[in-house]
Regions:
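Bacterial N-terminal signal peptides that target proteins for export
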Residues: 1-8
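N-terminal leader/targeting peptides and immediately adjacent processing regions
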Residues: 7, 21-27
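Active-site-proximal loop/hinge segments that shape catalytic or ion-binding/gating pockets
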Residues: 11
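C-terminal segment of classical bacterial N-terminal signal peptides
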Residues: 14-21
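Sequence context surrounding c-type heme c attachment/ligation sites in exported
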Residues: 26-149
Length: 149
């Protein structure tokens, strides 16, 4: 009876361990695919904002800019230690080596988007402001933290 009980415990523990490993792996996949989707979405939104600002459609651009800001803040949660490789990630290892600097850049990007929303109706050269407050952050990230294409 005691041996059967121990066998049951062993089988049950093995089952839960296998499920935990599979779930962890699935979570890594979800994290990497999730961050890729957020970056891809922000790229599409940035292009849309660019068009709207060229046409001086500031009111239409504002909610998109707020969405982009929120996306950058959300990205702070998408780079855990166990998500450095796999699933087509384009993230370079330097992200984890310079985690504080990377997180600061994501926060700066979020803050700069809010700043853009705040000043876009008041500036003389909206395109220059847009490049400074948005594209500069995109370029900083891509040039340091993303695999070249």
């Amino acid at each position: 009876m005691k041996n059967k009980f121990l066998l049951f415990i062993f089988v049950a523990a093995s089952f839960f361990n296998i499920n935990f490993i599979a779930h962890s792996e699935e979570s890594i996949e979800d994290i990497i695919k999730g961050r890729k989707a957020i970056f891809s979405n922000n790229a599409k939104l940035a292009k849309r904002v660019n068009i709207l600002l060229r046409e001086f459609e500031v009111e239409e651009a504002e909610p998109i800019i707020f969405e982009m800001s929120k996306n950058y803040e959300n990205l702070l949660n998408y780079f855990p230690e166990n998500s450095k490789e796999g699933y087509g990630t384009e993230a370079l290892p330097i992200i984890w080596e310079e985690k504080d600097a990377f997180n600061a850049l994501m926060q700066k990007a979020a803050d700069d988007m809010l700043q853009l929303a705040k000043v876009m109706e008041e500036v003389d050269d909206i395109q220059a402001t847009y490049k400074k407050l948005m594209w500069a952050n995109c370029n900083a990230c891509h040039s340091r933290y993303r695999k070249p294409h």
